[in-house]
Amino acid sequence: MAARTSQRTLARVASGCRPKSTTVTEARVRGSARNVRYLAPCGILMNRTLAPWASVLPKEICARTFFRITTPLVNKRKEYSERRIIGYSMQEMYDVVSGMEDYKHFVPWCKKSDILSRRSGYCKTRLEIGFPPVLERYTSIVTLVKPHLVKASCTDGKLFNHLETVWRFSPGLPGYPRTCTLDFSISFEFRSLLHSQLATLFFDEVVKQMVAAFERRACKLYGPETNIPRELMLHEIHHT
């Protein structure tokens, strides 16, 4: 009898010393809370439920969206050409255009204009142009063929990669000696993409004002232009 009692006592002691089964513990925990997992070795409760904000997140975050934005490339090179009959002689228009030291008095946005050097058929000029927020000086080499051609090419400056203006004067209408055919062209490329975009918006208006300014200058120096019959007038414009 004593022996049986001792065996039962030892069995109870042994069963009390056995570690609890992890799987049994997890099963009991799952039974009470399916969304909670108990890790027996470290005593941590892990919640299986997703955080509220996790359900509203997209499955795939488009981190590359910014780099996929495509904007149309702006052509930085702008070109404009114009042909027209003007009621002034070739010599008169040549004198107006070649008198670059006077540009500051009548050319829109021209703040300063100086002749740096001069020799037969050529001169070197420096112009300062300004219209908010741009204020820039640049130097040009000017080719002169009296009374037919005035061609100016920018040789330096931080504003332009390329700038060239060409004025050509040829005989006008038969029977109207105080007329000439004007061929004007300008091509330029800004260094700055921002300036190129602005030029795209205002380019046509700026060029028209420039050409009109030279006509007004001729009117101031030589009086009213020759009256040309409407049916004989010519005015062609091309730009890119």
From Swiss-Prot:
Annotated keywords: Membrane, Mitochondrion, Mitochondrion inner membrane, Transit peptide
GO cellular component term of the entry, any: mitochondrion
Domain of life according to the entry: Eukaryota
Pfam families xref list: Polyketide_cyc
GO biological process terms held by the UniProt record: cellular respiration
Keyword Membrane: yes
Disulfide bonds: none
Feature: transit peptide: 1-20
Intracellular or extracellular location(s): Mitochondrion inner membrane
CDD domains (UniProt xref): COQ10p_like
GO molecular-function terms, A-Z: ubiquinone binding
Subunit organization: Interacts with coenzyme Q.
Family stated for the protein in its record: Belongs to the COQ10 family.
PANTHER family, per the entry: COENZYME Q-BINDING PROTEIN COQ10 HOMOLOG B, MITOCHONDRIAL, SPERM PROTEIN HOMOLOG
Protein name: Coenzyme Q-binding protein COQ10 homolog B, mitochondrial
Gene it is expressed from: Coq10b
